Amino acid sequence: MLHEAETWVAVAFVLMVALFIYFGAHRMIGEALDRRSARIRKELDDARQLKEEAQKLVAEYRSRRESAEREAQEIVAAAQADAERIAQEAKAKMEDFVARRTKAAESKIAQAETQAVADVRAAAAEAAAAAAANVLSQTVKGSIADNLIEKSIRELGGKLN
């Protein structure tokens, strides 16, 4: 049995384990495993904390985005309302402008009609006065005729104008 290799491997193994125990290798291995376990636990805690912070940031950014979208919608709605109000004001101003221009045109037309009527009356009065002067000058002779014609022309001109 002493000549077999397996025996010597077993003896060497037992001696080596005894030496490890004697020098405290099991404590060092346990402490190393404990340190590694603690480091892994810390890394997991850090990762969990980072994940929570990331989730908070994501929620905050979503909230900000939604707020910005609402604000943008409010701005668009306000702009549409302003545009509609401006269009209505422009339409009202245009209608007022057209009404004033129409009234001014009607006033000018009425003035032109009045002027035309006055011009026609004046022309008719002049024609009537000339005709009356012509008739009187042919029928009445002398200084009486001249005085009568002048008087009639003055009276006729005053009455027709």
From Swiss-Prot:
Keywords: ATP synthesis, Cell inner membrane, Cell membrane, CF(0), Hydrogen ion transport, Ion transport, Membrane, Transmembrane, Transmembrane helix, Transport. InterPro entries: ATP_synth_b/b'su_bac/chlpt, ATP_synthase_B_chain. One of its GO terms (molecular function) is proton-transporting ATP synthase activity, rotational mechanism. It is a single-pass membrane protein. The chain crosses the membrane at residues 5-25. Pfam families: ATP-synt_B. GO terms for cellular component: plasma membrane; proton-transporting ATP synthase complex. It is found in: Cell inner membrane. Signal peptide: none annotated. F(1)F(0) ATP synthase produces ATP from ADP in the presence of a proton or sodium gradient. F-type ATPases consist of two structural domains, F(1) containing the extramembraneous catalytic core and F(0) containing the membrane proton channel, linked together by a central stalk and a peripheral stalk. During catalysis, ATP synthesis in the catalytic domain of F(1) is coupled via a rotary mechanism of the central stalk subunits to proton translocation. Component of the F(0) channel, it forms part of the peripheral stalk, linking F(1) to F(0). HAMAP family: ATP_synth_b_bprime. Belongs to the ATPase B chain family. F-type ATPases have 2 components, F(1) - the catalytic core - and F(0) - the membrane proton channel. F(1) has five subunits: alpha(3), beta(3), gamma(1), delta(1), epsilon(1). F(0) has three main subunits: a(1), b(2) and c(10-14). The alpha and beta chains form an alternating ring which encloses part of the gamma chain. F(1) is attached to F(0) by a central stalk formed by the gamma and epsilon chains, while a peripheral stalk is formed by the delta and b chains. PANTHER family: ATP SYNTHASE SUBUNIT B, ATP SYNTHASE SUBUNIT B', CHLOROPLASTIC. This is ATP synthase subunit b 1. The lineage of its organism: Bacteria, Pseudomonadati, Pseudomonadota, Alphaproteobacteria, Hyphomicrobiales.
